[in-house]
């Protein structure tokens, strides 16, 4: 067996062991759900890293993101030519300024309802596949697309309706992600395909960790997604 594979198996075992060791309620850990998440994450990682179609999809996504960054960088160069056309450019202008022009794209997609539909579809599928509560699954997908701060803002209505234990779960999950602007900055430092591959894998890892550290049983009548209409009726 490949030594690299053995090291990774040991790492996953240690990862699960430490999470179980610090669990708030070891008796309520849902091993079936965690096993499904581990299996799904393994298949996802293999698909994105090894499978040709998966690698092609990641490369296309990375190329698209890099094209957005380059286009935004052209705008920065037009506005701040004296700051950009230098031998040693500051990180503010080389990595962060272009992101300020890219992030509004997510706002536009949200405004027209495109991004919410994608998030809801993926969140619903993840919940059905793994057996995790609906909102936690939706929130994981929101983090993947929007980042922690934006996801919390979008989900503010739901946060007011769920109990403190589930809020703790979301707080833990929020520590595992970064905003789109930081991801964009990372793509300027290393190949974008590695960054974009790590994002969905990391989201599933976050679900695994919180399912063990803070296991919560959600009754069927509470396993819902809050909407403005349902809130007004309540």
Positions of the model-derived regions?
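Alpha-helical membrane segments and immediately flanking helix-loop junctions
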Residues: 129-187
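Hydrophobic alpha-helical transmembrane segments
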Residues: 6-10, 31-49, 96, 118, 137-152, 196-201, ...
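Long, contiguous bundles of hydrophobic transmembrane helices that form the permeation core
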Residues: 203-234
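N-terminal alpha-helical transmembrane segments of multi-pass membrane transport
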Residues: 1-92
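Hydrophobic core segments of alpha-helical transmembrane domains in multi-pass membrane transport
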Residues: 11-22, 37-49, 97-108, 177-185, ...
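Membrane-embedded alpha-helical segments and adjacent helix-loop junctions characteristic
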Residues: 50-143, 234
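C-terminal ends of transmembrane helices
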Residues: 17-26, 110-111, 152-157
